[in-house]
């Protein structure tokens, strides 16, 4: 069952995750994390292995850049940054090692809006998983899973909390990727307090 061990989820954690899944069109499940940055790291770690290449939009949230250029690099994952407006150059970056693309809309620092369906479509042509930091728009403003993304990540600190009384993040995905998110989170002990989820 779902309640056989605390780190596997409590009634409040499951209730929040299920509510967030309902707000994310196309999602089969949502994982909760202790922060938005933890959600970013956990999601990326669920789809990447040593030797892989990650393509990252060049105007993403600074911690996302750092996860790619430091943490993932130490694990043998190469990160390459791209201009989301230069589709030809972006398409030219793909090779057999590129396994994932990290998008963000709008860009955290610049509020630039990119053509997510087009970028995701190019990634899909090359068999890459598409992740998006959808914190500003959320699934209510931009249903990313319906526009070609595989995993959508949100900092709940900003929207679910917003009053400096909650620190949390989430990642939502379809069935196959949700299973990977859940497995990786369990191995890393990435969970939130049942009280915070209430």
List the predicted regions and their residue ranges:
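Conserved N-terminal alpha-helix of the aminotransferase class I/II PLP-enzyme fold
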Residues: 1-38, 64, 68-70
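Conserved PLP-enzyme active-site core in the AAT-like
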Residues: 29-198
């Amino acid at each position: 069952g779902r309640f056989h061990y605390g780190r596997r989820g409590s009634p409040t954690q499951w209730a929040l995750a299920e509510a967030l899944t309902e707000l994310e069109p196309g999602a089969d499940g949502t994982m909760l994390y202790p922060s938005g940055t933890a959600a970013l790291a956990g999601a990326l770690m669920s789809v990447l292995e040593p030797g892989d290449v990650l393509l990252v939009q060049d105007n993403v949230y600074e911690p996302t850049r750092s996860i790619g250029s430091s943490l993932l690099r130490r694990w043998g994952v190469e990160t390459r940054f791209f201009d989301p407006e230069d589709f030809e150059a972006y398409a030219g970056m793909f090779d057999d090692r590129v396994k994932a693309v990290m998008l963000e809309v709008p860009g955290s620092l610049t509020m630039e809006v990119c053509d997510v369906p087009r970028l995701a479509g190019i990634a899909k042509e090359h068999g890459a998983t598409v992740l998006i930091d959808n914190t500003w728009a959320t699934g209510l403003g931009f249903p990313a899973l319906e526009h070609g993304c595989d995993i959508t990540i949100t900092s709940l600190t900003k929207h679910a909390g917003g009053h400096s009384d909650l620190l949390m993040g989430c990642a939502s995905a379809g069935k196959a990727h949700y299973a990977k998110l859940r497995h990786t989170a369990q191995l890393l002990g990435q969970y939130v307090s049942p009280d915070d989820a209430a």
